[in-house]
Amino acid sequence: MAHYAIGDIQGCFDELTALLGKIGFNHGTDTLWLTGDIVNRGPKSLETLQFCIRHENSVQIVLGNHDLYLLAVGCGEGALKRSDTIEPILKHPDGGKMLDWLRAQPLLIREGGRVMIHAGILPQWRIAKAESLAGEAEAELRGKKYVKFFSKMYGNKPAAWDEGLEGYARLRFIVNAFTRMRALTFKNELDFDYKSTVKKMPPYLRPWFKAPDRQNLDHTIIFGHWSSLGYTNADNVISLDTGALWGGQLTAVNLETEEITQVQAAGGIDWKSFAK
């Protein structure tokens, strides 16, 4: 029995199939964690989502920003863009059932000393606190007022955590931290503009996992989201988004041995085509 984690797939289903074949994944005995952003921009978002649903006994996902975007569009709180590849899901006869399944998925998974989240965990949040906050947002996602939740979800404010935050401002910050965070100011404020490498990061920012006051070093945090960061295994974090969507690799890590396995992506998105 082996336990693997794989980074952002974003509809790159052929690469996922090849990677599972390369590691010899067995749905009967092995388990798989996916770091979120299972859909969108890659060519086979529908097939990837169907795979996750079909194998839910062996595959666990956390929600990423693109998965939440699919849910928002699906309930009328978002508009499709030229770069999106989620329309086949929305038009599928079972599209509603697939969205209901996706909406029931967690933002955070903890098993023993490991935690999986899409983007990261705020440095000042202990793991128990992060679990509790994830539960607040998950309750809204799964509740009767989920459409209103999606109507209030988008926005970059508040930028900093305050325990006194309430209502949708509180929920928005929680979701932004878990699904969009990369860089922080030295006051632990979220910065959504910076998306490049750590080496090129301006001096007034730092990666969320490099904050000196981190309260969650007692767990290994597995995440994706930051493709320009690439594979990283340091500071009690394992970063797994290695840019399959952009012509990079799709990466799996054996969580017991920390051995990584990669497959080269077949192609990559040419964003110039979307600018025409």
UniProtKB/Swiss-Prot annotation:
Highest taxon above the source species: Bacteria
UniProt keyword Cell cycle present: no
Keywords: Hydrolase
Protein known as: Bis(5'-nucleosyl)-tetraphosphatase, symmetrical
Family stated for the protein in its record: Belongs to the Ap4A hydrolase family.
Gene Ontology MF terms: bis(5'-nucleosyl)-tetraphosphatase (symmetrical) activity
Catalytic activity: P(1),P(4)-bis(5'-adenosyl) tetraphosphate + H2O = 2 ADP + 2 H(+)
Broad EC category: hydrolase
Pfam families: Metallophos
Organism field: Neisseria gonorrhoeae (strain ATCC 700825 / FA 1090)
EC number(s) stated in the UniProt entry for this protein: 3.6.1.41
Role summary: Hydrolyzes diadenosine 5',5'''-P1,P4-tetraphosphate to yield ADP.
